[in-house]
């Protein structure tokens, strides 16, 4: 199995191509079972964050961004004020799932900023923009993790050249399942494999 094939199997958070649901790995079943679940409702998304079905700050942020985009796509009507009012209710509801999750609030606030910065646009365009913003959040996380990996791999190569013993010690949730891809502390190993 190549590194890319591995990543395809363990993408923690992704939106289904048809945008009908948020697709996550249910991390409460790990390590014994890798099971993907689809989240369609505000209750399912809230519960997945609350019950740690999705774990790791970056992964929670991506789940929140995709979750609010999915929920906003179902808001009826084409009047901005009514749309924004309902968006805020949904945002606040998702935010209540994990009161200490910094990336949860960061992602939801960023999504809200995208809505308010585009209030002159029609609601359909704003809904599309929210999916694009969620994609950006996920892609930025991938690039951050990759950057960590490249720097870390460079340091590991230097240690190896010096003949020093190499070890990687992680704490908390620092692997690929905590992020959109690569992980944080584990990223240098994946970059090395690439």
Task: Describe the function of each predicted region.
Residues 1-43, 47:
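Positively charged, low-complexity intrinsically disordered leader regions
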Residues 53-63, 67-194:
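N-terminal active-site beta-alpha-beta segment that forms phosphate/nucleotide-binding
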């Amino acid at each position: 199995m190549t590194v890319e094939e591995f990543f395809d199997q363990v993408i923690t958070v992704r939106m289904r191509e048809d945008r009908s649901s948020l697709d996550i790995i249910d991390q409460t079943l790990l390590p014994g079972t890798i099971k993907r679940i689809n989240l369609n409702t505000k209750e399912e998304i809230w519960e997945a964050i609350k019950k740690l079905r999705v774990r790791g700050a970056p992964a929670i942020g991506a789940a929140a961004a995709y979750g609010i985009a999915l929920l906003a796509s179902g808001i009826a009507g084409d009047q901005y004020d009514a749309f924004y009012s309902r968006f805020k209710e949904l945002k606040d509801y998702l935010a209540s799932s994990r009161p200490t999750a910094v990336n949860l609030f960061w992602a939801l606030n960023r999504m809200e900023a995208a809505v308010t910065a585009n209030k002159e646009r029609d609601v359909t365009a704003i809904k599309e923009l929210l999916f694009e913003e969620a994609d950006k959040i996920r892609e930025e996380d991938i690039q951050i993790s990759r950057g960590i990996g490249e720097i870390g791999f460079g340091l590991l190569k230097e240690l190896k050249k010096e003949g020093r013993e190499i070890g990687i010690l992680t704490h908390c949730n620092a692997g690929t399942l905590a992020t959109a891809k690569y992980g944080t502390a584990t990223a240098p190993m994946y970059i090395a494999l690439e």
